[in-house]
């Protein structure tokens, strides 16, 4: 036990350096594994058996939005219930990102799953007060129509488009793609924004024929299950890939920088649990769908079950995360600097572990045998 405790302290030291990011982290992180950066040994080091060794035993307060970015988190609760989670979790759901932001800034939350561009903006506004730990969702946006008049971007000219996500991913992705397809988003179309995707689906349900909207999964699936006349006309992920060579990223998971510095061992334990939760979301569709309904992420399990395979739920951390997010933010910045808070975030924005972490993890694993 003493040997294991010493190694946990060494792990905490390594992670505290990583949490600071910067030149020290960047110089040693280039060879770190991406999705494998938190190996199985971390689970052993931060298991419930060793919970007393963690820097805090308080429940980890993490917020998410109703929809795809939180679908990868729900299995944390089942893991906690069956005793396989490394931590206790307080998962809080909100309808809009602007409900999460003040709580995160005030320290009422430890982590949150939010849009990628919002994370960059918050990093600027808080002077480095948050860091991004993982990509959680890739492209999930679609243009849908209640009719049969839209077959390409050109058909959107002169039309009204209902959308959610003003100031976040839906707005900037839509505007970017409109411009790339020869349309001025301020002149050639009218975009009406709503706070939540559920409001857009309600508007579409009540709308006349030929209404158009931008919706994410699982709301596309939910709307189509209620209205068979609603059809997908444009997959915005495919459209993005057609004109851009970067990965379209919808959501990321962030942590307060202060929390990460104080509790690096908890971060390691969380990332291990999180990777398992995402794996379960992609493999145990029935179980995850039931949890989505139980928690309130999606209204009905049947909707979640049908939508989950289309939600592009992922776990990407380390250097792969940094590469994908930085490239995506560069595209947004080039189109509109305001989209990422006026300037691109520096290296401290990315919570990445130095490659030496793997050696510490290996030592912990060997000592636990």
Where are these regions (language model features)?
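Bacterial lipoprotein signal-peptidase II cleavage site
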Residues: 19-32
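Short, glycine-/small- and polar/acidic-enriched structural segments
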Residues: 38, 44, 49-193, 214-217, ...
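Pocket-lining segment of extracytoplasmic ligand-binding domains
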Residues: 117-118, 126, 199-293
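Conserved C-terminal helix/tail region of periplasmic/extracytoplasmic solute-binding proteins
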Residues: 326, 330-369
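Bacterial Sec-type N-terminal signal peptides, specifically the leucine/valine-rich hydrophobic h-region
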Residues: 14-17
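Secondary-structure end/capping motifs
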Residues: 260-339
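Positively charged n-region of N-terminal signal peptides that target proteins for export
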Residues: 1-11
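A bilobed periplasmic-binding-protein/Venus flytrap-type ligand-binding module shared by bacterial periplasmic
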Residues: 75-77, 141-152, 247-265, 314-317
